[in-house]
Swiss-Prot record:
Gene3D superfamilies: Actin-related protein 2/3 complex subunit 3. Functions as a component of the Arp2/3 complex which is involved in regulation of actin polymerization and together with an activating nucleation-promoting factor (NPF) mediates the formation of branched actin networks. This is Actin-related protein 2/3 complex subunit 3. It comes from the Eukaryota. It is found in: Cytoplasm, Cytoskeleton. One of its GO terms (biological process) is Arp2/3 complex-mediated actin nucleation. The lineage of its organism: Eukaryota, Amoebozoa, Evosea, Archamoebae, Mastigamoebida. The keyword Cytoplasm applies. GO terms for molecular function: actin binding. Its main location: cytoplasm. It comes from Entamoeba histolytica (strain ATCC 30459 / HM-1:IMSS / ABRM). The keyword Cytoplasm applies. One of its GO terms (cellular component) is cytoplasm.
Amino acid sequence: MTTIAKQDKIFMKRSGAYHSELDKDIVQKAGNFPLMQFKTKVKVNPKFLLKGDDMDIVDEAITYYKANVFYKNFDMSICEADKLLVYLIFYIQSLLLKFNGRTKVECDKMAYSLAIENFALPGDGKFCLGGIVEPLKASEKEVVRQYMTAIRNETGLRLTQAVFKNDPTKCDKWWMCFNKRKFLNKTI
């Protein structure tokens, strides 16, 4: 059992933020980090593929980003899916910082390269959720890395569609006005 650091307990205080309603889509847990189904055209393990037009965790993260980015506290004990939602909000925040002043084509390329770069896995020392997520077993690491790469890639694709909805040459100002906000006073 891992101990939760004092600063991470502050994370978990009750807040009025939007929480995930998609606990039913959790397919597997790695440590205590949820791996959920999502819609994608990116290559992913079939058990993580969500069919249909229902809202998935990526839709939730993009939809709730603007509202949740203002919160300094987020209670992740309400549902397990919140851990992935918070991670995706951090990821969206890092993408928006890089999108400023670029075109859709440039942002698509940047989002893809950011998705496949080396990143901290849940339970690693540099992972953005710190002590809230348990370390992974050696057998889980490769599955989680593939899953996280696919969901980061899909999040980047959908975010560029949202940010460049009106004009492929210019970022939407209603998205970019949030790019300097720090969700939970952290970045990834």
